[in-house]
């Protein structure tokens, strides 16, 4: 074993000579074929994939695609639309080996997303098991392609190894954009990531193929694919999950003895919420008990996470670092502070270790090295072009410089980079002051205790909060409780940051592949479909209180009796299946108990659904009884 700093330095020296995906592929082929490339965690089993099996699959896939795609011209765009899988990268290499450019597609993309992609890339085929509606695209079954019945074809023609991939931005602000990378730019990104990581808190950790890295972000996302390519190059064992659930994440870390993990904020925040629900506190001991003793280093990317998450992990002696990046540039920076305090200062890295040169564009048009404004970046790892109507459009730089505009409002202070918000999300009030919804949202975190989603955006120059909850959880009682929480939080906010209204809805938020709320679409929905939202003005608002404590107490007694639990261990937010571990037999018993005692009719599907808390059931009974 070597230290990360030593091994990463060697990898950087190697990457200095690489300019293509073919270089990368040939390097991987030199790995010990008996080493494990990936462990794959399914619902009830684990599958291991050796390098030998991985490269045999690449050859089989290359022959299969050569037959299936023979009608299309080389250099055409072929998409991969899959959930994370050990053979995701094998599909990518097999397509590149056939001289097809590869587009990484969101497996859960919207109709608008795929319409945009097909129109602007002239996509000819997609490898997937979940086709979207299209008359111009050929769909190739992934399960058929990786079938063990298919064997390598010795008659396969050697073709030029393609050197382009593309990704489509998530449309956070309402607009999609397909960005194209060459292999040279991706190799530079890998080198930059390793250059940052070798100075991180992980620098003295020992590493070899026995060390496991959990790749949890979706691989069509720049954060996910760069993490997979980086750690595959290093030679660790990758770990993936079939399901993108919190339980599968926790299970993979424990069962796989994972040492390193990468995920988006939603996962880390859901984890801390789960721990609080299960252990009734957010402490380092509870986190360690949940994740085991082997986890050492976590990277959070895709969006900004809460300070509470960072603090909890670092207190548990798990180095937790936030990174900043974008589809157009990959991972740009990472907070690599060597102490807990430096990793908890809210920064997402430092300009001196970032992969790109950085400048600040102020609202009055000045370009500064430090200050608050839109971030400008420049570097060799930035995308090469965009796809529009089937043609590649060269990168657009700012005022004929080498810099591009990121659309992100940041502050650079003493070299540290602090992400504030998306420029298009910033609310400029009637006084000309900037209000950042992303920062404001942190104050309303107590709302999450009620199993809801929320976000803040600007309407008519003022901040408003939108709260989404399930139809089963929606009641006058819960609405008034949430309103009271918002009112209490508002009391402690400056006048210009107080939210002026709440919009309640049972509609799920439109989200991106990075699990960010598409605020542009949400605001559009409020304007075009007001019937889907219940507006509560917060000016001179008096809150009516409803009590359902008796019902909650009765339910706690039920679970205490049937599950042999201490009443003190039960609270309103206890998740019945995930935390109290009630099985289908107990849930059926609960169904009968409620109907008989409260003389109400309820849908059985409601009782059997996951993520149902004692409070959810109590609210349902309160509404119907």
Residue ranges and their predicted role:
Residues 376-430, 434:
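Conserved ATP-binding/catalytic segment of the ANL
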Residues 427, 455-458, 487-545:
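Conserved C-terminal "lid"/linker of ANL adenylate-forming enzymes
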Residues 48-51, 164-191, 197:
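Conserved AMP-binding A3 loop
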Residues 36-72, 83-85, 110-115, 183-184:
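Conserved AMP-binding/adenylate-forming core of the ANL superfamily
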Residues 258-263, 271-343, 357, 451:
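Gly/Ser/Thr-rich phosphate-binding loop
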Residues 187-212, 219-286:
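Conserved AMP-binding/adenylation subdomain of ANL enzymes
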Residues 239-241, 309-364, 368-373, 381-385, ...:
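Conserved ATP-binding loop and adjacent catalytic segment of the adenylate-forming AMP-binding
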Residues 47, 64-109, 215-216:
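Conserved AMP-binding/adenylate-forming
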């Amino acid at each position: 074993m070597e230290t990360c700093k030593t091994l990463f330095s060697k990898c950087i020296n190697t990457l200095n000579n690489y300019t293509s995906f073919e270089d990368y592929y040939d390097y991987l082929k030199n790995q010990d074929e008996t080493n494990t490339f990936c462990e794959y965690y399914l619902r009830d089993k684990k599958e291991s994939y050796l390098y030998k099996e991985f490269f045999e699959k690449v050859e089989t896939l290359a022959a299969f695609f050569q037959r299936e795609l023979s009608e299309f011209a080389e250099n055409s765009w072929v998409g991969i639309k899959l959930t994370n899988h050990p053979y995701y990268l094998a599909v990518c290499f097999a397509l590149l080996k056939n001289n097809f450019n590869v587009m990484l597609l969101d497996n859960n993309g919207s109709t608008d997303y795929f319409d945009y992609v097909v129109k602007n890339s002239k996509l000819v085929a997609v490898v997937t098991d979940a086709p979207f509606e299209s008359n111009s695209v050929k769909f190739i079954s992934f399960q058929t392609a990786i079938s063990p019945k298919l064997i390598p074809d010795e008659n396969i023609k050697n073709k030029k190894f393609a050197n382009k991939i593309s990704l489509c931005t998530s449309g956070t602000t309402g607009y999609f954009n397909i960005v194209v990378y060459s292999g040279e730019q991706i190799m530079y990104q890998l080198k930059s990531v390793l250059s940052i990581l070798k100075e991180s808190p992980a620098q003295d950790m020992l590493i070899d193929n026995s060390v496991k890295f959990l790749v949890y972000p979706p691989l069509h996302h720049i954060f996910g694919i760069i993490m997979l390519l980086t750690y595959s190059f290093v030679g660790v064992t990758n770990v993936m999950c079939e399901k993108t659930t919190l339980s599968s994440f926790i299970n993979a870390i424990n069962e796989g003895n994972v040492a390193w993990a990468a995920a988006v904020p939603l996962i880390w925040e859901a984890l801390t919420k789960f721990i609080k629900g299960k252990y009734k506190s957010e402490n380092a001991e509870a986190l360690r008990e949940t994740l085991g003793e082997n986890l050492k280093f976590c990277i959070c990317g895709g969006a900004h996470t809460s300070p509470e998450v960072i603090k909890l992990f670092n207190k548990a002696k798990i180095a937790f670092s936030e990174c900043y990046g974008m589809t157009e540039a990959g991972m740009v920076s990472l907070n690599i502070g060597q102490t807990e305090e430096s990793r908890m200062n809210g920064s997402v890295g430092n300009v001196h270790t970032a992969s790109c040169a950085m400048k600040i564009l102020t609202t009055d048009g000045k370009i500064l090295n430090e200050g608050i404004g839109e971030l400008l970046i420049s570097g060799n790892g930035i995308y090469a072009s965009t796809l529009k109507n089937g043609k590649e459009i060269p990168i657009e730089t700012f005022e004929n410089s080498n810099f591009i505009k990121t659309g992100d409002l940041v502050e650079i202070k003493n070299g540290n980079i602090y992400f504030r918000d998306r420029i298009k999300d910033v609310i400029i009030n009637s006084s000309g002051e900037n209000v950042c919804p992303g920062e404001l949202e942190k104050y309303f975190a107590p709302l999450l205790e009620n199993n809801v989603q929320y976000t803040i955006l600007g309407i008519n120059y003022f901040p408003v909060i939108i709260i989404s909850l399930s139809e089963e959880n929606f009641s006058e009682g819960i609405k008034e409780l949430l309103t009271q929480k918002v009112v209490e939080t508002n009391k402690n906010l400056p006048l210009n940051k107080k939210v002026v209204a709440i919009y309640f809805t049972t509609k799920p938020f439109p989200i991106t592949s990075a699990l960010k709320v598409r605020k542009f679409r949400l605001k559009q929905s409020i304007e075009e479909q007001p019937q889907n939202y219940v507006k509560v003005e917060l000016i001179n608002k008096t809150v009516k209180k409803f009590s359902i404590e008796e019902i909650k107490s009765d339910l706690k007694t039920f679970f205490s009796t049937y599950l042999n639990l201490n009443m003190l261990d039960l609270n309103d937010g206890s998740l019945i299946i995930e935390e109290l571990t009630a099985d289908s037999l107990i849930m059926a018993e609960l169904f009968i108990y409620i109907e008989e005692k409260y003389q109400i009719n309820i849908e059985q599907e409601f009782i059997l659904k996951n993520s149902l808390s004692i409070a959810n059931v109590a609210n349902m009974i309160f509404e119907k009884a």
